[in-house]
């Protein structure tokens, strides 16, 4: 229990990616470039899937929302992180910290579910191509995406409420570059068993549950591809899901390393911070590249968009 006489924490201090003063400006420039590329890439995907009529399919509808989620996830983290590289006292208020944690949880949970939906979409497209447009209808897509955001929001509210229901009255130094569950609970001066349990169950349920959907979908996809007689047909079928397979492997590998571990009262180590950098900033930057460079439809749509844009400027 928390002691009777204490001063309640009103602000937190973030240690950041590195405490070395000489690295602050170089790190600022590196992460500024990362965030800039993330913004450009994901906004590009959102724009292309919105304006190009050939990309108005369920596959690209889900990709559009994945790009939106990636954009939101990095925006919750990056701006504050960049500011902290330039200031000596890296403080964040209690409510600002709670808002950042809630926003991060909303987007990361939504991304986990969205990747599972995209795997199911690829499963139907390859295993049941004749029924694809009937099964994965526009109405169903809207419903699934809406439920994804609703579930992400509900999870964020519940988990962040439990994390901030405990007392913070001793140290206020968060060993991280943003407000996250594990380093926050390590600072609490009250019993953290319940919030730690909620965090662990939520993370394990979301990651393992969605991972099962992904694995089952791709197991059936592989079986269907192996049944295709021609090598050209197998190559074409594989190419439709290769980008998503790569994105899923990178994302789940990093997330499993980070979150599916026994409860601990210890704050994050350097490896955990690097994993956090990877899935909050690097993966949102990589996804547009993965889905565009390995996708003929997206590359063709980009060429059409740039051609039309250049033509519009010439006729002005």
UniProtKB/Swiss-Prot annotation:
Gene3D superfamilies: Rhodopsin 7-helix transmembrane proteins (1.20.1070.10). Residues 1-25, 76-99, 161-197, 259-272 are extracellular. GO terms for molecular function: G protein-coupled receptor activity; olfactory receptor activity. This is Olfactory receptor 8J1. It is a multi-pass membrane protein. Belongs to the G-protein coupled receptor 1 family. InterPro entries: GPCR_Rhodpsn, GPCR_Rhodpsn_7TM, Olfact_rcpt. Keywords: Cell membrane, Disulfide bond, G-protein coupled receptor, Glycoprotein, Membrane, Olfaction, Receptor, Sensory transduction, Transducer, Transmembrane, Transmembrane helix. The chain crosses the membrane at residues 26-46, 55-75, 100-120, 140-160, 198-217, 238-258, 273-293. Disulfide bonds join 97-189. Glycans are attached at residue 5. Odorant receptor. It is found in: Cell membrane. The gene is OR8J1. GO terms for cellular component: plasma membrane. Residues 47-54, 121-139, 218-237, 294-316 are cytoplasmic.
